[in-house]
Amino acid sequence: MLGIDTNVLVRYLIRDDQPQYERARRLVTRQSAKGEPILISLLVLLETEWVLRSRYNLAKADICSALSALLDTSDLAFEDEATIEVALYNWKDSAADFADCLIEARNRRLGCHGTATLDGKALKLPGFVSI
């Protein structure tokens, strides 16, 4: 398995630099032909959401759709797909940041009964507790 960095994933999704997109696409195709999916870590996914939102000004709904589509791609593997699915589900209808949704979902998968926070938006999500 081969992991990728955020810039490769962003090029794969956005296609704003055709030569770099082609390099990313060929990498995914080559790995798939070898039966080795590309790994997307939680950190890469989190940074990708940030780049799509802050650099490309994509709407939350568009980012949710793009990240959800990645989950359906058999050529890609994810560090913790179940956590990502829960985080995306919670994020789509909340005012909280994707990072908060990912933190809470990951903590719950690791056995935490809650996640303490001072973030008012995060407190509106199930699983966060105020301190």
Where are these regions (language model features)?
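Alpha-helix capping/helix-boundary segments
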Residues: 44, 83, 102-103, 121-122
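Short, well-structured N-terminal submotif of metal-dependent ribonuclease cores
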Residues: 1-40, 55-62, 68
